[in-house]
Amino acid sequence: MVNVNKSFIVIFSILLVSCYTEETPYSNSLISSPHPLASQAGNIIYSKGGNAFDAAVAAAFTLTVVEPSMSGIGGRLQVIYKQADGDILGIDATTQIPEGFKTEDKELPSYGYSTIGIPGVVAGLIKLHEDNGVLDLKTVMEPSIALAEDGFYLYPGEIKRLQSEIEKIESFEGTKLYFLNSEGKSFIPGDKLVQKDLANTLKIIAKNGKKGFYEGEIAEKMVNDIQENGGYITKEDLKNYTVRKSEVLTGKFNGYDIHTLNLPSYGSITIQMIQIFDQLKINNERDWTLKISSAVEESYKYRFFQNNIDSVNSILSLTRAKQIANNIENNQTEVAFNSNLYEMDVADIAQGHTAHLTTSDKYGNVVSLTQTLGPNMGSRVATKGLGFLYNVTMGPYLGGYLGEEKPGDRASSHISPTIFTKNNEVVLALGAAGGRMIPIAINQVAYRYLKQKFPLSDALIMPRVYKYESPIYIESHLGVNRFNDYEIYSESQNVERIRAEAYFGRVHAIALDTINKKWKGSADPDWEGSVSDFK
C-alpha cells in the first residue's frame, strides 16, 4: 500500500488552483446605459463575479432610482438576450390592463390614476435574474438601494425633465412629496435627491423577490391608493401578474441576422424597416436623407397590421422589403432648395422618454433591455410611502395602436430591444428610448455601423432622420452639427431641423471587435449616458 503525505496533497492542490487561469471567449465585460451611476452599478456587479444578466438587473434597478422620470418599478419592460453558447430568448414584462377596466370609458385622461396598468418591471427583472444570474438578488440590488437611501446629485437631464412636469407634479400629493425639493419647488442644479421610501420598497423586493412587490404591504398600499382615486388595479390583478416568454423574430440585413421581439414590442416593424434600408442605393448623404426617411414612412404604415401571424409574416418578407425599396427608388424626385430654412424647436414635446441599457460579458452573455413608464413621468402618480411613479397604460397615450383596449391586454409600443448576429455570434446589441423614434434610431445606428462601416461612436452621433405624414425631420443640435458636410440636405425646403435633445431617441449599444474578441460600447450623446468596461 502506497502512503502519500497529506501535506503534500494540500500543497499541490493549492499550487494547482493558483496556477489556473480562467479562459473565456472574450477579454472583457461591458455595460452601456443612460446614466453613469447605472453603468457604475453594472461594473460593481462585474467586479463581484456577476455576469451580464446580474449587471443588467443591477443597472436597471439603479435607473429606476437615478432616472425616475424615464423608468421605474411601476413601469414595463422588454428584454432580448443571448446566453453564452445558447439561444436568443425574450421576456415580456410589459404593463397589463386590469380586469376591472371599463372598456366603455372612452374619455380617459392622458395621465392620472385611471391610466395606470399593472406594473411589470419588478417581475421581469427578477425573472431575468432567476433564470440567468449567478449572484444573489440582494447583492445585485445593493447599488440601487444605496443610491436611493443615501441620495445622489441630480444630473441636468433629469432636472430638466422634472421641471417640465411641475404643474402635473403639483396635482398629486405623493408626487409632490418625492419630486419637489425641500422648499416645494422644482429641483435645480446642485440639488441632491434622497429617496428613503423607495429604498425601503427596494429592500423588501431584495428580501422577498416578486412576492415582495405583488403581494403583502407594498401591494396593499398600491391598491388602496389607486382604488381610492379612481384607478382600476386590485390585489388579484397584482397577484396574478406573470412574466411571459416573448416571441423572438428574425430577419436579414447585409449578411447579418437581426433578432428582436414580436408584440407587444414593435419588432416586426424594426426588422422590416432595416430590410428596406438594405435594398436602397445610398451613395451620399442626400440619398440618406431622402431615401431613408421615405423608408421610415413606408414601414410605419404597417404598424397597425401586426396583430396576426399572416400580417407579421408579410411585414417580415424580404420580397415585400424589395418591393417597397424599388418604389422608393423609382419615385424619388428632385427637391427645390430654400435658403430660408425653418428651424423647429420642439422643447415642449416629450423627448426621449424610456430607458435602454445593454450588457455583455466575457463568457458571451448579452442583454438588451428596455424599460419605461410611458411618457415623461408616466402617470405622474406616486403613492405616499412607496416612493415610485406608476406607468401610463390606458387612455390616449397607447390607445388605438392595435385596436380597442380590453382587460388582460398588454400595452403595445415601439420598444424594440435588438441583437445582430453572424454565425451565431453577437456582433451588435442595442436599443433605444424615444417612443415612436425607437425603431428609427436603432436601425439608423445599425446601418451606419454594420453597412457604412462607421465607428460605433460615430454611428451614434450622426444625424438621424424621420418622416411620417410630415416634412423630413433631421436631427440638428450640439453634438450632431460637428458633421458639417451634411449641411447640404438641411437646405431642402422639405426638411426641418429639429433642435431638441433626445427627440430622435437615445441609443445605447455594444458591439464586438471580432478580431480581438473584445466588447466595445457607445452611449448616446444626448443627456448623460455612459459606458463602463470591466476587464
Where are these regions (language model features)?
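Bacterial N-terminal signal peptides that target proteins for export
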Residues: M1-F8
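Bacterial N-terminal signal peptides
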Residues: F8-L16
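Noncatalytic scaffold domains of N-terminal-nucleophile
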Residues: Y20-Q40, I44, K48-G209, F213-E215, ...
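Active-site rim segments in enzyme catalytic domains, especially the processed small/beta chain
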Residues: V65-G72, I80-K82, L89, Y232-I233, ...
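Short beta-strand scaffold segments in enzyme catalytic cores
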Residues: S71, G75-Q83, A355-S360, P417-I419, ...
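Short, small/polar residue-rich loop motifs at catalytic or cofactor-binding pockets
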Residues: R244-K245, Q351-T354, S413-I415
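Internal maturation/activation junctions in enzymes
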Residues: I282-T372, L386, N494-R499
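Extended C-terminal subregions enriched in glycine
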Residues: Y363, D409, I442, K451-E501
